[in-house]
Amino acid sequence: ADVPGNYPLNTNGNMYYCTILGENEFCRKVCKVHGVKYGYCFNSHCWCEYLEAKDVSVWNAAKNYCKNPVGK
């Protein structure tokens, strides 16, 4: 079964590059920043399972999930 998801984008609007394919601690952390629990390295970029389009940009994800009230 294919799990939906997206490639998250960093502050420059680029995908997160990764070198260790599959299980990847860096990608898991990236995906948590974007508001989802799990992700891995696929085709040299981090992929996040269940990442919705509204949270693909790290700026949007930060606004949606950051607890810091600055800028709200």
Swiss-Prot record:
Disulfide bonds join C18-C41, C27-C46, C31-C48. Keywords: Disulfide bond, Ion channel impairing toxin, Neurotoxin, Secreted, Toxin, Voltage-gated sodium channel impairing toxin. GO terms for cellular component: extracellular region. Expressed by the venom gland. Has the structural arrangement of an alpha-helix connected to antiparallel beta-sheets by disulfide bonds (CS-alpha/beta). Binds to sodium channels (Nav) and affects the channel activation process. This is Toxin Acra II-2.
